[in-house]
Structure formats: C-alpha cells, structure tokens
Amino acid sequence: MTTASALLDRRVATARGKSVLTRTRKTAPREDVGLRMTKPVAKMKSASASAKNSIALLRRPAPFSSAAAGLNGAANPLPDDVLHAMRQFDDRAVLVTGGSGSFGRRFVETLLQHSRARRIIVFSRDEYKHYELQQHLEPLGTERMRFFIGDVRDGDRLEIATREVDYIVHAAALKQVPAAEYNPFECMRTNVTGAENVVRAALRNNVNRVIALSTDKAANPINLYGASKLASDKIFIAANNMAGKTDIRFAVVRYGNVVGSRGSVIPFFRKLVDEGADHLPITDERMTRFWITLQQGVNFVITSFTMMRGGEIFVPKIPSMRIVDLAQCFAPDLPLRVVGIRPGEKLHEVMVTEDDSRLTLELADRYVIEPAFAWWQRAPYTASGAKTVPDGFRFASNTNTDWLDGEGLRRLLAEAF
C-alpha cells in the first residue's frame, strides 16, 4: 500500500517538475509558480476522490511526531528538556486564559499528564467547551482541574480566578484577521483591555510568572489584530516595571500559524475536500507563513517559563512554507484558484524586525528580544551561549533559511489529524 511519504514524493514530482518541497535550507522560495486553474468536470470528480484518499493516508500515525503521548493517539514522549522544565510546576497552581481553545486544551492536557501541578485552572467564556474539555480529560483524572467561566474583559472575575495562582498562560484572544477588521471595538476589548486585566490581576494576587501568547502579526502590523497584539505585548513587557521589587515577572511568546488550530487553513482545506470541492482557493500564490504544531507551541511556552527573567519576547526558530505548496500537498489533484488577499492580510510574516535586531539574542532553538529596560542585563543569556544577531537582522517567512520539505509537511499534517 502506498505510504504517506511516498504519496507526498509523487505530489512533489508532479506539482511542477522540481519542487521547493525538497529541503531548501538557506534558499528562498522560487516565485515561478504555475497554477492549474481549470480541469474537465469528469476529472474533477476523480480528483476529489483522490484528495480524500490522500487525507486518509495523512491521518495515519507518522513514524515521528512532536506530540506528547496522550488522548489523541500520539505515541512519542515529551523531549527531555520539556520534561525537566515540568518540575517548575510541582505543587503549583497554573491558570490558562482561553483554556478551552486549541492551544489551551493541549497545554492543559500536557500539564495533566506530565506535571505535578497542584491545580490547573481553565478560564474561558464557553460553558459547553468546558463540558467538552472535562469529558475529553476524564480518562486522565480531573481531580486537579478547575473550570472558571469568565471573560478576560471582566477584571473582577479574573482577580477572583487568579487568587493563589503561581503561573498564568494568557492564551485568550480574538484572532481572526477579517473579523477584527470588521469588529474593531470587540477586538480591542478582548486583546488589549483583556491584557490589562490579566496584568492587574497578576499584580494584585502576586502571581509568580506570566507568559502571554502573541503572534507574528504583531511585528510590523498592518491589521487591527496585529496592532492589538502589539499593544498587548507592550502591556505585558511594561508590567515588569509595575512589579517593582517583587518577584512577579511577565514575558511574551511570539510564533506563527498553528497547524490544525480552529479557523486555520488546514481544517478549512480538509472541510472542502470532505465536501467534494472541485478546487482549493488560495489568496496569493506567493504567500508564505511560519508554521508550528500545537505541541511544539506548548513545549516552547513551558521551556520559556524556565528561562524568563522578565520583559523578553521569545521567538522559536520554526520553518516556513508556501501556501500553494501546502494546498498541492494536501490535495495534489485538485486545481487551485487564486481568490485574492483578505482584508488585513500580508503576503509574508515577520517575527523579528530589523528594528528589533539590536535587542535580539540568538540561542540554539530560539531568538530572544530583550526589553529596553535600564535595569536589564543580558549576562545570564550570554553565559548560556546566546549570541547577538547582526545589525539589521530580520526573521521573516519569505527569507527564512528553513523550509518544510515533503517529509516535514507529512509530519505536520499527520499530527494535525
């Protein structure tokens, strides 16, 4: 039977003769993309069936996955450094805002399986999602779990929820770019006022460590969502000055698109194929994005907690991928149709800007953007092997030196499903 790896190899070969999906480290993507815009109707039907078969193959467990062993069937343990970092949560209380969302669910599940946290608190608005998460986690035992219905816009409710809490992961956000453009007040209330409320609650309740999730869209933002997350980042970084001489520390984690998260392109493509679509829509054939899996994102947050000193923005070194390559690997026999960029979208994303470069340190697995605090000292990082990046350095999805090949895409898709 044809394996998923072999299937992708054929897709790569047929997509355009010679594909960028073979490893192209230190090589930017080519721009000469030939899109197949039309096909006979009879062939369309067989293409849709072929695409469904492709997804069935991609759903099979991969030989390698970054996911933790858990309820979703992944068979690989956490990396040693992440398991070691789990010790920081021993006998501690951890609260996750947006805890019933894609990231929150995986983070909570990982803590429940691999940590000795005293209490794990899910804080989110949706009662039904709380119920679903409770049912999902039941096989692991939920004695340590607490479920708070609340909105980050409600500062009083947050203050109650964060009492006797040691760690906060702030994952609650309105993140859909077009929705934010058309609902600006709602976006700002959740993403900016919500950030302020989390900071105030953490300061009042002496929460030890707080990490806020950010996005590549917060660097050089051109849309309201990115601007709101940039404002949120600034609030969390400045909160370290508000903490004064206490031991309360705030930091930010910034990464790109999460494979398989709700509202992302992969579930969208999957839905279209399952419904028998005769083409896949893409916004622009030149578009590139950073990609990270849910579990990789969770692991990155956990290890960032261990090294944070307060005020940093942690950026993982993750690969880029062209949207057209994702579409062709997901459903190789379906034609692609360019539908145009949506309001607020960029062709390429940036996670470290040229202006950030003078404050950026490089470690083996991440970049660390330092705060411009007078009291900040980089010695602990340089002692650990961190190096300064060249002046004018830029970490962008289109100039990245690490590009997903067919095998990498197979792993990501296998984990997503």
Predicted regions and their residues:
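Strand-loop microenvironment adjacent to phosphate/nucleotide-handling motifs in alpha/beta enzyme folds
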Residues: 4, 11, 45, 51, ...
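N-terminal Rossmann NAD(P)H-binding glycine-rich loop of SDR-like oxidoreductase domains
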Residues: 93-110
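Conserved glycine-rich Rossmann-like NAD(P)H-binding loop of the short-chain dehydrogenase/reductase
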Residues: 116-129
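Conserved residues in the N-terminal Rossmann fold of short-chain dehydrogenase/reductase
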Residues: 124, 148-149, 189
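Residues in the short beta-alpha loop(s) of Rossmann-like NAD(P)-binding domains
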Residues: 126, 216, 319
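Conserved Rossmann-fold cofactor-binding substructure of NAD(P)-dependent oxidoreductases
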Residues: 146-167
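Conserved Rossmann-fold NAD(P)-dependent oxidoreductase catalytic core, especially the SDR/UDP-sugar
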Residues: 167-170, 174-230, 234, 238
